[in-house]
Regions:
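Glycine-rich, proline-tolerant flexible connector loops at the mouths of alpha/beta enzymes
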Residues: 35-76
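Active-site beta-loop-alpha junctions enriched in small/polar residues
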Residues: 11-13, 40-44, 101-103
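Hydrophobic faces of well-ordered beta-strands that scaffold small-molecule active sites
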Residues: 6-8, 35-39, 96-99, 107
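Glycine-rich anion/phosphate-binding loops
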Residues: 15-27, 79-80
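Conserved, mostly hydrophobic/aromatic
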Residues: 9, 28
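N-terminal amphipathic alpha-helix/helix-capping segment at the start of soluble metabolic enzymes
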Residues: 1-8, 82
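Active-site beta->alpha loop and helix N-cap motifs at the rims of alpha/beta catalytic domains
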Residues: 59-107
Length: 107
């Protein structure tokens, strides 16, 4: 019988901070014994319409920018930061995964 893989969905709960993201990976590995961590990747300009991007965050208290677009951009990591997280995962022995929300992010 094949053992199922346990995946920890980290998504954007790292608050746009690479060190928080890496700490979440380490915590998932150490305390939850998961096999895989999963993040998300979006190209905000592909993902949001101009109107959505320029609108305020629906819950201003939780926003990392003046607009929803700025908020979403703040939470996104660059390709180099994705590589840094992948290297951290390799170092501690956990699989890295990222779901993409648009074609540009997949390329």
């Amino acid at each position: 019988m094949v053992k199922p893989k346990i995946i920890a969905e980290i998504g954007c709960n790292h608050k746009g901070n690479i060190e928080i993201a890496k700490a979440m990976v380490s915590t998932a590995k150490t305390y939850c014994n998961v096999d895989v961590v999963k993040f998300q990747k979006r190209d905000i300009k592909s993902f949001l319409s101009t109107n959505e991007s320029n609108s305020p965050h629906p819950v201003a208290y939780n926003s990392y920018g003046k607009t929803y677009g700025e908020h979403r951009e703040f939470l996104e990591f660059s390709i180099d930061q994705h590589k840094e997280r992948k290297n951290h995962c390799d170092k501690i022995g956990i699989e890295y995964s990222s779901s993409v929300w648009d074609l540009k992010s997949a390329l």
